[in-house]
Amino acid sequence: LIVNFSNLEIHYILGNHDCITKFTESLKKLSSKHKSLKIHGTQLQIDRLLFLHGECTNWKMDESDLIRFRHAWSQKKMSPRSHALLYDAMDKLGVSKGFHNCYYPKPVTVKRVAYHLDKILPNWREKIDHCYFGHTHLAFQNYSLDGVHFHNTGSGIRGMEFLPLNFSINSSPNNK
């Protein structure tokens, strides 16, 4: 994508699986070679749209909680093939989907995101119309809380819904 569409900006928001030190180092090298690739640590705001990976949906997280959570992930090494096979089996059996459905119901999940935003972005409700995030693997769109619409693009994992979403951009990015 970077080579074939070098005239476009590609924004990559790091998530927990991306925080492994060797991976982030490789991404930094890649982005230094390709100026069209923009790497964002926790969020990207473009106009009145906010994009997050979504780890803050695990529990009510403030910024220091997110930093600790990601630090733990950064220390991980690649899982052995047996873990990947076990994860794949759980997906085939529907266990992963069942867990996600129980642990990430929309109202609870969106309230966790709102709590996180309250801690990291003062007055976000006045600055944001739409918040896009992932992590939970559960697709939904236009869940409204306090006038802000929340969207989750789901997951491309077998048995989960994947929901690519369109949005309109009006100005230049502000990000962290």
Positions of the model-derived regions?
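Extended recognition/assembly regions associated with phosphoester-bond processing machinery
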Residues: L1-K176
